[in-house]
Amino acid sequence: MSQIIDVPETLSLAIDSFLSYIEVERRLSPVTVENYQRQLMTIAQMMVAIKINQWSLLESQHVRMLLAKSHRSGLQPASLALRFSALRSFLDWQVSQGMLAVNPAKGVRTPKSGRHLPKNMDVDEVSQLMNIDLKDPLSVRDRTMLEVMYGAGLRLSELTNLNINDIDLQEGEVRVLGKGSKERKVPLGRKAVEWLQHWFAMRELYSPEDTAVFISTKSGKRLSVRSVQKRFELWGVKQGLSSHVNPHKLRHSFATHLLESSGDLRAVQELLGHANLSTTQVYTHLDFQHLAKVYDAAHPRAKREKS
């Protein structure tokens, strides 16, 4: 069992100030702030272990030593890069605040991690997942969540944070507040619109306590991230899918299927809410009207049924 090392205020106070800055001024999500806190407190504990109790005493050789120790402990390259990124951003902030003269992490490199193509479901598997037995309102709610997640390519947090006034059923659009509090509009697709209409007709039966689109049928409160993950996993098993079903996989499937059909990487980037095109390029083997046109022509569940 590893020993818990107390972090002195000479290290922790600066971390607390930085966390307040990224939460209030940069408006980063609670999950991101928590990740920063975890990484920086781990680094601070490692510094205490080598007798460094002030950030001003940290030098480049110490940064390399901390990274090497993290690597030896079994930290994978991607996780190591995340830890180093948190440290570098934190030290950059200290420089901007006049707390440090230079950033000791500048010029230090971490092992490169290869980017792997995210796993996704094929169109037949998506259809199998969606074809659920609608015996009760709970099933209707879950079917609607699945359709919206796949139809709009949302992040899990974006799905759970949706409010009624974010949905425009007439236009078939959803307003999403993504990473860094950046707002974007995304087409929903015909199937998602139809199922939202079904769910909205039932939602009021559960005395919703707030404006959340997706609520618990027991409490009427907004569904948590973990609750959605459990429901998606449950339906994957019930529908006999061989691979594990999770919200992220549906988002990846949305991106892959749309890119395969349209070849429009830039449009997919905008729909996913990626700040950098390089993030979207992992799926490779504008204005809103243009995005909607690409979506309507390419997405499997946006196409009109033939009469």
UniProtKB/Swiss-Prot annotation:
Coiled coil: none annotated. InterPro entries: CB, DNA_brk_join_enz, Integrase-like_cat_sf, Integrase_catalytic, Integrase_recombinase_N, Integrase_SAM-like_N, Recomb_XerC, Tyrosine_recombinase_XerC/XerD. One of its GO terms (biological process) is DNA transposition. Residues 116-296 form the Tyr recombinase domain. Pfam families: Phage_int_SAM_1, Phage_integrase. FtsK may regulate the catalytic switch between XerC and XerD in the heterotetrameric complex during the two steps of the recombination process. Disulfide bonds: none annotated. It is found in: Cytoplasm. Keywords: Cell cycle, Cell division, Chromosome partition, Cytoplasm, DNA integration, DNA recombination, DNA-binding. GO terms for molecular function: DNA binding; tyrosine-based site-specific recombinase activity. The active site is at R155, K179, H248, R251, H274, Y283 (o-(3'-phospho-dna)-tyrosine intermediate). Residues 9-95 form the Core-binding (CB) domain. One of its GO terms (cellular component) is cytoplasm. Belongs to the 'phage' integrase family. XerC subfamily. PANTHER family: PHAGE INTEGRASE-RELATED (PTHR30349), TYROSINE RECOMBINASE XERC (PTHR30349:SF81). NCBIfam families: PRK00283.1, recomb_XerC. Site-specific tyrosine recombinase, which acts by catalyzing the cutting and rejoining of the recombining DNA molecules. Binds cooperatively to specific DNA consensus sequences that are separated from XerD binding sites by a short central region, forming the heterotetrameric XerC-XerD complex that recombines DNA substrates. The complex is essential to convert dimers of the bacterial chromosome into monomers to permit their segregation at cell division. It also contributes to the segregational stability of plasmids. In the complex XerC specifically exchanges the top DNA strands. Forms a cyclic heterotetrameric complex composed of two molecules of XerC and two molecules of XerD, in which XerC interacts with XerD via its C-terminal region, XerD interacts with XerC via its C-terminal region and so on. This is Tyrosine recombinase XerC. It comes from Proteus mirabilis. The gene is xerC.
